[in-house]
Amino acid sequence: MARKYLVMAERTPKFDASVIEPHRTFLQELLAAGRLQESGGFTDGTGGAYVVLAENHAAATALVHSDPLHTTGASDLTIHEWEITISA
């Protein structure tokens, strides 16, 4: 059974806007594979977050570590298993 993982992305000093398009392509690929639930940027421009589905934390980490934000060092990514207790 897949679990939800919240991925928080915080921009680093190495951030370059040219990574945004490859990051969006990465997210579109996750969406097409049924692994992405939602994503978006923070309105203050410091980063963003997305929710992925994975079997366990190790699988979520492997998935997220292929994000161009991570591979280029543009953002620090933090992964939390997320247990939703209230939802609309």
Where are these regions (language model features)?
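Conserved, structured core segments of small domains
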Residues: 1-88
